[in-house]
From Swiss-Prot:
<dbReference type="GO" id="GO:0005737">
    <property type="term" value="C:cytoplasm"/>
</dbReference>
<dbReference type="GO" id="GO:0016607">
    <property type="term" value="C:nuclear speck"/>
</dbReference>
<keyword id="KW-0963">Cytoplasm</keyword>
<feature type="region of interest" description="Disordered">
    <location>
        <begin position="48"/>
        <end position="69"/>
    </location>
</feature>
<protein>
    <recommendedName>
        <fullName>Heat shock protein beta-3</fullName>
    </recommendedName>
</protein>
<keyword id="KW-0346">Stress response</keyword>
<dbReference type="GO" id="GO:0005634">
    <property type="term" value="C:nucleus"/>
</dbReference>
<dbReference type="InterPro" id="IPR008978">
    <property type="entry name" value="HSP20-like_chaperone"/>
</dbReference>
<dbReference type="InterPro" id="IPR001436">
    <property type="entry name" value="Alpha-crystallin/sHSP_animal"/>
</dbReference>
<dbReference type="InterPro" id="IPR033894">
    <property type="entry name" value="HSPB3"/>
</dbReference>
<comment type="similarity">
    <text>Belongs to the small heat shock protein (HSP20) family.</text>
</comment>
<feature type="domain" description="sHSP">
    <location>
        <begin position="55"/>
        <end position="152"/>
    </location>
</feature>
<keyword id="KW-0539">Nucleus</keyword>
<comment type="function">
    <text>Inhibitor of actin polymerization.</text>
</comment>
<dbReference type="InterPro" id="IPR002068">
    <property type="entry name" value="A-crystallin/Hsp20_dom"/>
</dbReference>
<dbReference type="Pfam" id="PF00011">
    <property type="entry name" value="HSP20"/>
</dbReference>
Length: 152
């Protein structure tokens, strides 16, 4: 098997490089897409994993599993380097601000400090109370707004 050249470490975190080499680039395209922001919805990923040609089909033709609402707005961020208390999520005048920063820490190469700030324009009519954020065990931060029709 030929080696795969990975050009962007933000899109392909180091911890996944061995998996990509073992499975091949084509098999990992959906996993790789998680790190392009704003990310695809979880429903799109589930549809695509079930049938490889699902990305080419119209999204309205696929059914949503029962009990699983559609998200109008969703962001996936890889924040594995940060502790939950290092992450700040704010809204301001229709914008979602996500900030994270940690002080100097020791790693395998020496000392490092990291920080980032991301801004996303919220859809019209979205209020702070409509947002939910989940930090998954694998270091992925999911911020989303559920469809208001789901609550009715």
């Amino acid at each position: 098997m030929a080696k795969i050249i990975l050009r962007h470490l933000i899109e392909t975190p180091v911890r996944y490089q061995e998996e990509f080499e073992a499975r091949g680039l084509e098999d990992c395209r959906l996993d790789h897409a998680l790190y392009a922001l704003p990310g695809p919805t979880i429903e799109d990923l589930r549809k695509a994993r079930g049938t490889p040609k699902a990305l080419a089909e119209d999204s309205d033709s696929a059914e949503t599993p029962p009990g699983e609402g559609k998200s109008r707005f969703q962001i996936l961020l890889d924040v594995v380097q940060f502790l939950p208390e290092d992450i700040i999520i704010q809204t301001f005048e229709g914008w979602l601000l996500i900030k994270a920063q940690h002080g100097t820490r020791m790693d395998e190469h020496g000392f490092i400090s990291r920080s980032f700030t991301r801004q996303y324009k919220l859809p019209d009519g979205v209020e702070t109370k409509d947002l939910s954020a989940i930090l998954c065990h694998d270091g992925i931060l999911v911020v989303e707004v559920k469809d208001p029709l789901e609550t009715k």
